Amino acid sequence: MSLSAAEADLAGKSWAPVFANKDANGDAFLVALFEKFPDSANFFADFKGKSVADIKASPKLRDVSSRIFTRLNEFVNNAADAGKMSAMLSQFAKEHVGFGVGSAQFENVRSMFPGFVASVAAPPAGADAAWTKLFGLIIDALKAAGK
């Protein structure tokens, strides 16, 4: 339940410029997710039933996006450590199943995240596959937890 050291390095190198401006990039990613998958907003108590325009104007956007990007940063920083990843994925899956969030929602994220990363800065060759694998681990953990 981890990435290889080389995969983790690729994810980390492509993630660094994104996380360097985590506030703006986190907001932009969340808005892009809601624009592409409008039902995704309904999984967030602060955004349920709101339009993308209302979400963009919400003071809660930064709080939510910051929590998401901080958590994702933890996954990236520990991606090659099977023991840590196993524990983190298990905890993450339990939390998200409790919110009603399952593998389908993270399939949506996985489908667009490498492109989002590339929109911030050109990733190294192979980074897309590393991100696909990382989100695959999250999806597998959610499936194992029943979602």
Curated annotation (Swiss-Prot):
Report whether Acetylation shows up as a keyword of the record: yes
Q: Which GO terms describe its molecular function?
A: heme binding; iron ion binding; oxidoreductase activity; oxygen binding; oxygen carrier activity
What else does the entry mention about this protein?
A: This molluscan globin lacks one of the heme-binding histidine residues found in most other globins.
Q: How does it assemble?
A: Monomer.
Q: Which residues carry this modification: N-acetylserine?
A: S2
Q: What highest taxon heads this organism's lineage?
A: Eukaryota
Give the residues the record marks as binding heme b: H96
The record lists the organism as: Aplysia limacina (Sea hare)
The entry sums up its family as follows:
Belongs to the globin family.
Supply the name of the protein.
Globin
- The answer to whether keyword Membrane applies is no
A GO cellular component annotation here is: hemoglobin complex
Gene3D superfamilies hit by this protein: Globins
The UniProt record lists the Globin domain at 2-147
Task: Give the residue range of the signal peptide.
Answer: none
**Which keywords label this protein?**
Acetylation, Heme, Iron, Metal-binding, Muscle protein, Oxygen transport, Transport
Which SUPFAM superfamilies does UniProt cross-reference here?
A: Globin-like
